């Protein structure tokens, strides 16, 4: 068994697999001013999606991002700046950009688990809703209403409309009509921007076939298609990546980007399973899982991954400790991918070692290999295998385990173009 990498052979570009949902927190107040903005910047996080931002007080809570939070009275004049409240959204998006990330803007509402709903009902007037979105985009990108020129490229229509009544209270057919109306209007108004969605919560073939049939009938443009997946096996994500790509291609959307923009470790959604999920997400095993999924999806026909969630008050945040914002183990996997992303060129590799997931990049000066040993087995054992690079040189091993946070632990001299590596279960190493 071996892992073979050829740093001299480029096979493509490293994709933005370390994007996240939500951004850092920052305030210039004199007290209660903890921030993880420098951590974001250091990790080279490329995009931050603004879904569920309004759940978080630190981002502006119920006065930020969501359409009904910005345009609070749907009967108001959508062409009047006085009808909009941009204040806290402007600050939040500015913080994301200050951290070096680009904004991926979700148009719609946060999820609503409550018995009473406020922002997930079908709009009274689909065309007017699209006009409201138009003016939000104008404010962010064209300076309208004392706005900005942020250059936000991705604009996503809605979130999880296929997820019972927590995100959309209308019928599927109502959503198809709504999406078609909004997408066609916004793409005609902003042809250079990427308009897409709808951030489906899973692979429901019946729902998706009907959705795409409607889109084709209406000639609805779709620059990107977004979908979600949660699971405990890497194959959960790679198999869904293939199914969603096949769905797009089957319906003629062959040039549409496929973006997995919610994902995380979940072994159960209730009771002990949910508790295990949350504990794992914040653990070293969760960090190995992050590195494994990013590495595996790099080789799938998926254009971007967006981890859920970097929201600072989220129980599913495996990157930053709630309250203190200390780095958790998962942060170092995201940061390691940020280094690969900065090198740009993906290098050829192959691996037949079970439960070993890897990705490699180089830029002419630096060579980097990311290796994750991820397993969901109850009693896994260490794995020893050969790493073949075809070069005789010194390599530094950086280790992420319970005792170390991606620190350089040893230097290995390759012999006859390779060396032997032993990894403990659910650890990650970077080799440079």
Where are these regions (language model features)?
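Mature N-terminal, pre-catalytic/accessory segment of carbohydrate-active enzymes
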Residues: 1-43, 51
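Short, acidic/polar
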Residues: 27-40, 205-216, 286-294
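Aromatic/acidic polysaccharide-binding cleft in carbohydrate-active enzymes
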Residues: 264-358, 363-364
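Glycoside hydrolase catalytic-domain groove-lining segments
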Residues: 223, 227-274, 303
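Substrate-binding cleft and catalytic face of glycoside hydrolase catalytic domains
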Residues: 43-232
């Amino acid at each position: 068994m071996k892992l073979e990498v050829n740093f001299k052979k480029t096979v493509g570009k490293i994709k933005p697999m370390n994007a996240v949902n939500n951004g850092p927190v920052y305030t210039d107040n004199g007290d209660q001013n903890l921030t993880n903005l420098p951590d974001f910047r250091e990790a080279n996080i490329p995009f931050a999606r603004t879904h569920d931002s309004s759940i978080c007080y630190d981002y502006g809570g119920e006065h930020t991002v969501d359409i009904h939070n910005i345009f609070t009275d749907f009967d108001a004049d959508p062409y009047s700046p006085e009808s909009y409240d941009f204040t806290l959204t402007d600050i939040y998006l500015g913080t994301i950009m200050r951290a070096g990330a680009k904004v991926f803007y979700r148009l719609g509402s946060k999820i609503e688990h409550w018995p009473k709903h406020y922002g997930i009902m079908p709009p009274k007037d689909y065309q007017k809703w699209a006009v409201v979105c138009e003016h939000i985009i104008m404010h962010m990108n064209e300076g309208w209403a004392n706005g900005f020129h942020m250059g936000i490229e991705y604009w996503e229509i809605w979130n999880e409309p296929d997820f019972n009544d927590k995100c959309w209270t209308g019928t599927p057919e109502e959503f198809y009509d709504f999406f078609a109306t909004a997408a066609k209007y916004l793409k005609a108004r902003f042809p250079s921007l990427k308009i897409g969605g709808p951030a489906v919560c899973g692979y429901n073939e019946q729902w998706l076939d009907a959705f795409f049939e409607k889109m084709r009938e209406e000639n609805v443009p779709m620059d990107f298609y977004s979908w979600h997946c949660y699971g405990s096996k890497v194959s959960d994500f790679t198999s869904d990546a293939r199914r969603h790509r096949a769905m797009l291609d089957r319906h003629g959307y062959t040039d549409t980007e496929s973006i997995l923009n919610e994902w995380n470790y979940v072994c159960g959604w209730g009771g002990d399973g949910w508790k295990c999920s949350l504990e794992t997400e914040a653990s070293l095993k969760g960090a190995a899982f992050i590195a494994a999924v990013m590495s595996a999806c790099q080789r799938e026909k998926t254009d971007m991954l967006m981890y859920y969630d970097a929201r600072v008050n989220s129980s599913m945040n495996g990157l930053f400790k709630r309250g203190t914002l200390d780095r958790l183990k998962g942060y170092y996997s995201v940061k390691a991918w940020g280094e690969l992303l900065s090198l740009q060129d993906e290098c050829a590799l192959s691996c037949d070692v079970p439960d070993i997931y890897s990705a490699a990049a180089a830029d002419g000066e630096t060579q980097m290999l990311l290796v994750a040993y991820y397993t969901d087995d109850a009693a896994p054992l260490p794995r020893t295998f050969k790493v073949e690079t075809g070069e005789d040189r010194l390599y530094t091993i950086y280790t992420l385990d319970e005792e170390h946070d991606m620190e350089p632990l040893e230097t290995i001299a390759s012999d006859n173009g390779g060396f032997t590596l032993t990894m403990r279960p659910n650890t990650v190493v970077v080799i440079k």
